[in-house]
């Protein structure tokens, strides 16, 4: 569930429910340089740069890297490219590549917001994460070798906090009634210095338009 920069229309108001999402562990065959090619093998649900998303009543299980994640577009942009402009590569068949100049699209928000994950069943038969990607290695060193059910990248926009430490409602993220889960907040914006499994700050609810 994602938005990319420089689209003519940006998506929001998404409901994903009654799905069985499982065993997505095949090698990533995306075209090199494309945004899809950066997704690690063993990823279940990814919610990227999209607002007003409800993920509920799903079974999400048996992924070797992560069952679900809520991330900014920024997590896919290599740090060396954020300041250094790189000549765009033309990919076949209109395939989208990672755009380090995404901020030039003033209508695009690279950050997820108003995401509510609730009433899902998370399971995993794997006891050890895949080590062919950086996230799997991160879980070994930071998460006791456990594969997260829900991960939040912790990359926030400048207006994430308003009136001191109050979170801007536009970027609210809530979790509820998903059973016993392994949750991680990465703090990826600060080299994982405040990496935590503490879920308390995200145990909340978000009201959505019932007509959607």
Pin down the residues of each PLM region.
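Boundary/linker segments of alpha-helical solenoid repeat arrays
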Residues: 27-29, 66-70, 125-133
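Acidic, glycine- and Ser/Thr-rich low-complexity intrinsically disordered tracts
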Residues: 76-212
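A generic structural motif
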Residues: 50, 63-65
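Right-handed parallel beta-helix/beta-solenoid
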Residues: 1-54, 70-79, 107-111
């Amino acid at each position: 569930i994602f938005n990319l920069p420089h689209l003519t229309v940006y998506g929001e108001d998404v409901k994903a429910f009654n799905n069985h999402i499982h065993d997505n562990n095949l090698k990533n065959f995306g075209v090199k340089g494309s945004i899809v090619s950066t997704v690690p093998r063993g990823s279940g649900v990814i919610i990227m740069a999209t607002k007003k998303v409800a993920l509920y009543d799903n079974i999400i299980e048996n992924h070797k890297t992560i069952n679900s994640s809520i991330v900014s577009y920024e997590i896919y942009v290599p740090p060396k490219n954020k300041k250094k402009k790189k000549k765009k590569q033309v990919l076949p068949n209109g395939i989208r590549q990672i755009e380090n100049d995404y901020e030039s699209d003033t209508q695009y928000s690279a950050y997820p917001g108003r995401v509510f994950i609730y009433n899902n069943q998370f399971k995993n038969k794997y006891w050890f994460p895949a080590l062919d990607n950086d996230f799997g290695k991160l879980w070994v060193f930071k998460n006791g070798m456990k594969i997260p059910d829900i991960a939040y990248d912790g990359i926030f926009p400048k207006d994430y906090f308003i009136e001191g430490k109050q979170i801007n409602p536009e970027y609210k993220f809530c979790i509820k009634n998903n059973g016993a889960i392994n949750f991680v907040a990465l703090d990826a914006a600060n080299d994982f210095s405040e990496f935590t499994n503490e879920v308390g700050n995200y145990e909340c609810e978000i009201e959505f338009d019932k007509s959607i």
